């Protein structure tokens, strides 16, 4: 058996119904569209979200909130990640080269999540109060 020779079982596939090809077919003349009206015409149907002139739901509800674009340039790094990284000195460039933060990232903050078991010297990176205490307890420093 070859993949290109596999065929469906006889009678398993039905031919597509061809509409508008004479009254003997059962779907001639109006082709299943009924008589008159917008939906019977070519190109005749409302746009998505149109409610017949009633104020649409999307406009009835109030605007709310926004997505800060500055978040695209910020990133967080955990203590566990720093521990796995294996570098003695860490800055934003080192994190980018290690692939821990994206290329567009400008601001990095270390958060206290997990544990740090070795000394790490941070420079040009923000830290939370808990993370700073954990880094200094492990013999590291924050510049």
UniProtKB/Swiss-Prot annotation:
Biased composition (Gly residues): 21-31
Pfam families: Ribosomal_L27A
Top-level taxon of origin: Bacteria
GO CC term (a single one): cytosolic large ribosomal subunit
SUPFAM superfamilies documented for this protein: Ribosomal proteins L15p and L18e
A GO term for molecular function: rRNA binding
InterPro entries per record: Ribosomal_uL15, Ribosomal_uL15/eL18, Ribosomal_uL15/eL18_sf, Ribosomal_uL15_bac-type
Stretches for region Disordered: 1-56
NCBIfam families, sorted: rplO_bact
Subunit structure: Part of the 50S ribosomal subunit.
Family affiliation: Belongs to the universal ribosomal protein uL15 family.
Free-text function comment from the UniProt entry: Binds to the 23S rRNA.
Name of the protein this chain belongs to: Large ribosomal subunit protein uL15
């Amino acid at each position: 058996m070859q993949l290109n020779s596999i065929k469906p079982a006889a009678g398993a596939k039905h031919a597509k119904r061809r509409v508008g090809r004479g009254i003997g077919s059962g779907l001639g003349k109006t082709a299943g569209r009924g008589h008159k009206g917008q939906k019977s015409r070519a190109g005749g149907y409302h746009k998505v979200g149109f409610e017949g002139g009633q104020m649409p739901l999307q406009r009835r509800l109030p605007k709310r909130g926004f997505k800060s674009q500055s978040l695209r340039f910020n990133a967080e790094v955990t203590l566990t990640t720093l521990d796995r990284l294996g570098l003695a000195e860490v800055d934003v460039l080192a994190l980018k080269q290690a692939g821990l933060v994206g290329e567009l990232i400008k601001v990095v903050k270390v958060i206290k999540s997990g544990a740090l078991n070795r000394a790490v010297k941070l420079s040009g990176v923000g830290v939370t109060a808990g993370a700073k205490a954990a880094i200094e307890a492990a013999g590291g420093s924050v510049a």
